[in-house]
Regions:
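Short glycine- and acidic-rich boundary segments immediately preceding or forming the N-terminal edge
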Residues: 1-42
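Active-site-proximal beta-strand/loop segments in catalytic clefts of secreted hydrolases
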Residues: 34-36, 59, 106-111
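Short, solvent-exposed polar/charged micro-motifs at secondary-structure junctions
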Residues: 39-45, 114-118
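Short beta-strand-to-loop junctions in surface cap/lid or active-site-entrance loops
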Residues: 44-52, 60
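Active-site/substrate-binding loop(s) of hydrolase catalytic cores
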Residues: 52, 67, 74-76, 80-152
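Di-metal (Zn2+ and/or Mg2+/Mn2+) metal-binding site signature of metallo-dependent hydrolases
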Residues: 63-69
Length: 152
């Protein structure tokens, strides 16, 4: 199966583009508002299934763990394809598994932290002086949000 999600680092606009592509391919996938980051970047949440109470999957809690964003988006792509096609994942029929159940996916809880980890000080926007001071000169291992707060 060819994945919609490719091997591009998940900067905010790339995640937005993936979500648009996933939504176009899988119209049953819904986007719901979930808030904005310190720097105003949207925090995306996608849902599927029919239950009021949903199981929540969250990725990108720490900036330097941006790979988890890609893993969750890839999983969501495969899950949606299996749901659409009546397929299975790990031997479990996805449509049957979602009867009376719902899932919610937050592919990047900390978009500011991911931007800082991937783009350096440019990703910190107006908080660049603070990030520069807190990072000790190296943003590649940046974990926190744009205020320097660890989200877990």
């Amino acid at each position: 199966m060819q994945s919609i999600v490719t091997n591009h680092p998940p900067v905010h606009q790339t995640v937005r583009n993936y979500i648009n592509t996933l939504h176009a391919a899988y119209p049953f996938l819904e986007e719901m508002p979930s808030g904005r980051s310190v720097l105003g970047r949207e925090i995306f949440c996608l849902t599927m299934g029919h239950a009021k109470d949903k199981v929540l999957y969250v990725a990108g809690t720490h900036g330097s763990e941006w790979l988890t964003c890609m893993v969750l988006l890839r999983f969501l792509d495969r899950l949606c394809a299996a749901y659409r096609d009546g397929g299975a994942i790990a031997g479990v029929d996805v449509r049957t598994a979602l009867l009376g159940r719902g899932l919610a996916f937050v592919p990047c809880l900390n978009p500011d932290g991911v931007e800082i980890a991937l783009r350096g000080y440019d990703g910190a926007l107006r908080n660049e002086p603070l990030v520069r001071r807190l990072s000790g000169g190296d943003t590649r291992c940046w974990q926190a949000n744009a205020r320097g707060v660890d989200l877990n």
